């Protein structure tokens, strides 16, 4: 299996390629108190992974998907991402990913190690991964990416905070994991040209958004929200409609 630290080969002279399918998850666990609809149950996640595999698809990290695309491969790959770095990833998501032969990118908050989702005013307090938990996920083959230091809206950050959330978070994670950190994920999915430039200057090879609007390129990759209500039929529709609704991404094959 390719290393999750692979970076896609330079593609700036290529014509835009089809938009990659990148699934966005958050927490895996109890959905009974979930005001933001960010949690999927372990049973639902397993059904979704089973659906992927039965369609001949395999979930991988974003870095692995982009590296495969740069080689002209990866038609059978989709990227799986888990935002915020919830502690339930180790006990609930990781065993299922392993069972179904998948990997994923885990976007974590090195400024909140062992903390909780204090940025959410509603819903239960959910514990976040500790430094040891992040290292365990990396050792299991997951790509570790940055979600910023503390989960702030980068479009509202001043210059000093913007640099801390992008460049400093990357440095902290690289020291923590001992491996290069090439991926970033914009908190709340909010992004503008200034945030993109800060992420690029911080040395990230790619960054994930949700709906980047008119922005395009490897530092504003769109993603598909996956939730508890996404049955096989809904997954099929999301998979098919994604490429129809999204413009090709500049800089990708």
Which ranges hold each PLM region?
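A short, flexible beta-alpha/helix-coil linker loop
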Residues: 28-31, 111-112, 150-153
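Histidine-centered catalytic micro-motifs
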Residues: 23, 27, 143-151
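Acidic (Asp/Glu)-rich catalytic clusters
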Residues: 15-17, 53, 95-101, 127-146, ...
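C-terminal active-site subregion of NodB/CE4 polysaccharide deacetylases
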Residues: 2-81, 87-90, 156-253
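Generic enzyme active-site microenvironment
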Residues: 81-82, 145
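A short, conserved beta-to-alpha structural element at the edge of catalytic cores
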Residues: 101-123
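Alpha-helical scaffolding within the catalytic cores
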Residues: 6-10, 90-92, 120-139
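Surface-exposed cleft-lining segments at the edges of enzyme active sites
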Residues: 115-125, 151-159
């Amino acid at each position: 299996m390719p290393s999750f630290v692979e970076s896609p080969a330079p593609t700036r002279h290529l014509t835009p390629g089809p938009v990659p399918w990148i699934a966005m998850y958050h927490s895996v666990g109890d959905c009974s108190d979930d005001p933001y609809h960010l949690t999927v149950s372990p049973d639902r996640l397993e059904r979704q992974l089973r659906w992927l595999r039965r369609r001949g698809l395999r979930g991988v990290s974003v870095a692995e998907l982009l590296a495969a695309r740069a080689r002209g491969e990866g038609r059978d790959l989709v990227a799986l991402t888990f935002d915020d770095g919830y502690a339930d990833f180790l006990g609930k998501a990781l065993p299922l990913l392993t069972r179904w032969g998948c990997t994923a990118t885990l976007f974590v908050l090195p400024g909140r190690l062992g903390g909780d989702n204090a940025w959410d005013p509603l819903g239960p307090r959910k514990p976040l991964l500790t430094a040891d938990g992040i290292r365990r996920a990396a050792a299991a083959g997951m790509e570790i990416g940055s979600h910023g230091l503390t989960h702030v809206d980068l479009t509202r950050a001043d210059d000093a905070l913007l640099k801390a959330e992008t460049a400093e978070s990357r440095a902290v994670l690289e020291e923590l994991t001992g491996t290069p950190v090439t991926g970033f994920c914009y908190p709340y999915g909010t992004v503008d040209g200034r945030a993109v430039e800060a992420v690029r200057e911080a040395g990230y090879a790619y960054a994930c958004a949700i709906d980047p609007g008119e922005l395009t390129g490897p530092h504003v990759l769109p993603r598909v929200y996956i939730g508890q209500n996404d049955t096989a039929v809904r997954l099929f529709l999301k998979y098919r409609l994604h490429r129809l609704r999204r413009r090709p991404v500049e800089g990708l094959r």
